[in-house]
Amino acid sequence: LKQVPSCEFFPLEAVKTNVIGTDNVLTAAIDAEVKSIICLSTDKAAYPVNAMGTSKAMMEKVIVAKSRTVSPERTKICCTRYGNVLCSRGSVVPLWIDQIKAGKPLTITEPEMTRFVMSLEEAVDLVLFAFEHGESGDILVQKAPACTIAVLAQAVRELFCPEAETRVIGIRHGEKLYETLLTIEECAHALDLGGFYRVPCDKRDLNYDKYFTQGDQTRNTLTEFNSNNTALLNVEQVKEKLLALPYIQQELAEWEKQA
């Protein structure tokens, strides 16, 4: 389950699907001797403040714990953490296009809110990278750019209807002003792999006696990676990103026919 407001009202359903459901799928895959499993998480799992993000954070814990129970030669289990995939089902750009078609103002939650943005092709690239380079228990993150909601809305308006109005409606249940793909704690162990970060899991076993005498002295070499400190796209850059999407190309073609 990925809809933030829905999970706020039905948190147990988020747990059943995102946490218990993940464990069920992993157990079945291990029993079937599946060689590689890539689980899809979200930036909302880092410093979660809503039910959806919390359930995804627990899902990540299940994935890492499960990876310790099986030899990576038998089954490799990795996790990818995403930002927003542009024009995915239930996302804001298709909503805005529908509002423009209906002659309604574009509804904006908070203009200065920032979000990571990536195309479906870039999302697939992250999964393929995880298959090729991930080790069991890893969390892998792509160095995605971000933009403000105001910039994203302006890009959509300029592509479809520059005279369309906007209306600020306020933040919805469980939303954050910015999202995080890597926490400052994860940055202490994250490996910079060019266009990606790899966060290896903690391989130490559950030996409480060692916890009193041994620790990890690794210090952060990276800062928290969030949608405020990554590269922020301007309107023209967002338009270029949108125009590369087949969904936008199709919607623009239909819109121009009606004009």
Where are these regions (language model features)?
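Strand-loop microenvironment adjacent to phosphate/nucleotide-handling motifs in alpha/beta enzyme folds
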Residues: 25, 61, 65-259
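Conserved catalytic-site region of short-chain dehydrogenase/reductase
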Residues: 31, 43-48, 85-87
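A short helix->loop->beta-strand "cap" motif at the edges of active sites that frequently abuts
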Residues: 32-36, 74-75
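Active-site helix of classical SDR
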Residues: 55
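NAD(P)H-binding glycine-rich loop region in Rossmannoid oxidoreductase-like domains
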Residues: 1-16
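SDR active-site strand-loop-helix element
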Residues: 1, 37-42, 80-82
